[in-house]
Design a protein with these regions (language model features):
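Active-/binding-site microenvironments in catalytic and ligand-binding cores
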Residues: 1-157
Length: 157
């Protein structure tokens, strides 16, 4: 059996914030029905992610995002990965964010039964290792389509 050909990874992420990005994308999708973000900047000191939404979340919804994130972290969900060929990708997983030259064998990352997506980044072993999640700020930029771009700036500690 020959070894699978995999894409290389050319950047170093801060694993707690990067894993929190996965949880946050899934939380936003569940709360607002939006797609995973296509624009994220993840760092140790602060991270920011944008989503396209039909309306700006209320202060109560923003507080709920932070609360849900900290509940998921406290739940100590296991984080695992597995290499899967494209023919065996779990149902519902979208591959449209992958680069054109992505290999046929993909590294899938599972966070408990809460989230699964292809990713070659670094992650913690369980959500408890993230520590805590704090929203530093949010912003809303209206778009001509009637919705807008919602940004969350966050920190993990």
């Amino acid at each position: 059996m020959t070894a699978p050909i995999l894409n290389t990874h050319n950047k170093e992420e801060y694993a707690p914030a990067h894993t929190a990005e996965h949880l946050l994308n899934q939380t936003m999708g569940r709360m607002f029905g939006c797609e995973r973000s296509r624009n994220a900047h993840i760092e140790r000191k602060k991270s920011k992610i944008n989503w396209i939404l039909p309306a700006c979340p209320t202060p109560e919804q923003i507080a709920e995002i932070e609360q849900r994130m900290n509940e998921l972290i406290a739940a100590d969900l296991p984080v695992r990965f597995e290499f899967v060929d494209r023919e065996h990708i779990p149902a519902g997983v979208k591959l449209d964010k992958l680069p054109e030259d992505a290999s046929e064998m993909l590294r899938m990352v599972w966070i408990g039964d809460y989230d699964v997506c292809p990713c070659i980044g670094t992650h913690v072993a369980s959500t408890k290792e993230i520590g805590s999640f704090h929203i530093n700020s949010t912003s809303w930029t209206p778009l001509g389509t009637g919705g807008g771009s919602f940004r969350i700036v966050f920190k993990t500690e």
